[in-house]
Amino acid sequence: MMEKTFIMVKPDGVQRQLIGDILSRFERKGLQLAGAKLMRVTEQMAEKHYAEHQGKPFFGELVEFITSGPVFAMVWEGENVIEVTRQLIGKTNPKEALPGTIRGDYGMFVGKNIIHGSDSLESAEREINIFFKNEELVSYQQLMAGWIY
């Protein structure tokens, strides 16, 4: 079954010019890009995005960081795309992330860990709706799919 997930290169990843490398990793894995945009996250969007952390001591820092500069927001499609992208991304704390993962290769500190990826189908749907309008997403038949799955 084709799933969708939300992936965001955070301000530190954008500033460090990692967008192209990150895109390439997902494309080389065989995932299909359905939408992408460079944007600024508003405070309201950040609060919705991090709603589950509201009331926690680090909530303010999360909102401040994600609104501190441009992000690169993306929607990817593929079979088991959430599981696959989370493996490519690596553990939340870059010190625990394996080499070869995005966070393992580029992350230094848990507060600036380069990238966000949805952790469930429910989260993906909620996050996609925060950052994208339906008409900004394009689903199409990937001609390589037969060679991947």
UniProtKB/Swiss-Prot annotation:
GO terms for biological process: CTP biosynthetic process; GTP biosynthetic process; UTP biosynthetic process. The active site is at 116 (pros-phosphohistidine intermediate). Disulfide bonds: none annotated. The modification Phosphothreonine is found at residue 92. One of its GO terms (cellular component) is cytoplasm. Keywords: ATP-binding, Cytoplasm, Kinase, Magnesium, Metal-binding, Nucleotide metabolism, Nucleotide-binding, Phosphoprotein, Transferase. Pfam families: NDK (PF00334). Its EC number is 2.7.4.6. One of its GO terms (molecular function) is metal ion binding. Homotetramer. PANTHER family: NUCLEOSIDE DIPHOSPHATE KINASE. Major role in the synthesis of nucleoside triphosphates other than ATP. The ATP gamma phosphate is transferred to the NDP beta phosphate via a ping-pong mechanism, using a phosphorylated active-site intermediate. This is Nucleoside diphosphate kinase. The gene is ndk.
